[in-house]
Amino acid sequence: RENMKRGAKNVKLMATGGVSVDGEQPTDVQLNEDELVAAVQEAHHKGFTAAAHAQGTFGIKNAVRSGVDSVEHAIYMDEEAADMMLARGTVIVPTLVAPWAINQHPDVLPEFMVKKAQEVADSHMDSMKLAVKRGVKMAMGTDAGTPYNDFQTAVVQELLMMQESGMTPAQVLLSATVSGAELLHVSDDAGELVNGKLADFVVLANNPLVDLRAFSKDRQVFKKGKLVFKS
């Protein structure tokens, strides 16, 4: 309630432990189902959305049952959790790049963090492959701000890793545009380049449906129809 009074339109709930904090494990349940339900109901009462950081099987299921709009990370997801998401329309924001980025710099980051990132990496990808196979809806997100996970280059790596999980380039692009806008309740203005919506778009030299690495160079970014970045 306090965060929403301050202007938050999405409430993120820490349903489980994580990789970046010492003294906890990704599988640790940090909020039980009743606690999650109380927060989700408050967000939805205001017409806002609720997301759950959930990296363990039990925490994921608690989050889905509580009615969150999305589950971030979804590591250690099993078939039951995937089917629950599919039945309830819960969206996954994979953030595959977050532990990947940590694992690229093992010599400069805290040992506890690197150890956990290495432990979850394979399970993270396996969970996304399961979700893709089941047909769970995805919305692209990077968890930017975690170590070596920046706002400039992480998106391309995330797109490539989502493709590695079994999504087609078209599905990946849909997750990064239409699906993200729908999840955040901004699809009236964003997510598609159509009449009546904001002219936010990227012009590329190459076709991303052929190679998603097209986003990594030779691009022009337009915001509300105005060029704001060129490489």
Give short role names for the model-derived ranges.
Residues 45-49, 109-112, 121-207:
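His/Asp/Glu-enriched, well-ordered alpha-helical/loop segment
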Residues 55, 97, 145:
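Catalytic metal-binding/acid-base residues of hydrolase active sites
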Residues 95, 99-116:
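Active-site loop ensemble at the mouth of alpha/beta enzyme cores that anchors a bound cofactor
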Residues 210:
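Small/polar (Gly/Ser/Thr/Ala-rich) solvent-exposed segments
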Residues 221:
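Short aromatic-centered micro-motifs
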